[in-house]
């Protein structure tokens, strides 16, 4: 856990790389993306500062390891930059899922070739300017009154 504190900048750098780089199908780009995704996953797992919960509603679209990596990167970035420590908050949920939607829209062709995540509903809400409200309501419905989560990972079935 202490090592994780020393390597926050590395985790943030990897998270930013994931969020800003398409997961391309060529060897060089893909390997760097995969290394960054692996680093973020391990940092999240070992750090005692970050807590991530996978919402049950994410089952439809988080079937794709690349989207899951984007979700983890967005949670990591939010936790570090906004200092959201030890909880999975509504703010983190909204930012992480919104990042996944924006990433999917920006890299739709590549994402559909890799795994075809079912993000139609979320993309439609985003385009209509209703995504944040939808995610806020979804969080409250799943987690009750919008309270931050303090339990560890929920892995989609």
Regions found by a protein language model. Give the residues of each.
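Immediate post-signal-peptide N-terminus of mature secreted/exported proteins
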Residues: 1-37
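Non-catalytic accessory regions used for complex assembly or targeting
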Residues: 1-6, 134-157
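Mature extracellular/secreted ectodomains of secretory-pathway proteins
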Residues: 28-142, 146
């Amino acid at each position: 856990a202490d090592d994780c504190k020393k390597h926050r900048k590395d985790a943030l750098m990897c998270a930013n790389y994931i969020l800003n780089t398409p997961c391309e199908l060529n060897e060089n780009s893909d390997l760097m993306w995969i290394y960054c995704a692996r680093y973020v996953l391990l940092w999240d797992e070992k750090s005692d500062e970050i807590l991530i919960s996978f919402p049950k509603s994410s089952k439809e679209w988080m079937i794709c390891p690349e989207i899951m990596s984007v979700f983890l990167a967005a949670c990591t970035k939010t936790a570090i930059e906004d200092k959201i420590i030890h909880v999975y908050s509504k703010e983190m949920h909204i930012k992480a899922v919104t990042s996944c939607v924006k990433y999917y829209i920006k890299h739709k062709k590549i994402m559909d070739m890799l795994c075809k995540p079912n993000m139609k509903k979320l993309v439609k809400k985003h385009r209509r300017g209703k995504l944040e409200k939808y995610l806020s309501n979804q969080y409250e419905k799943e987690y009750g009154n919008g309270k931050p989560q303090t339990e560890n990972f929920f892995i989609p079935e």
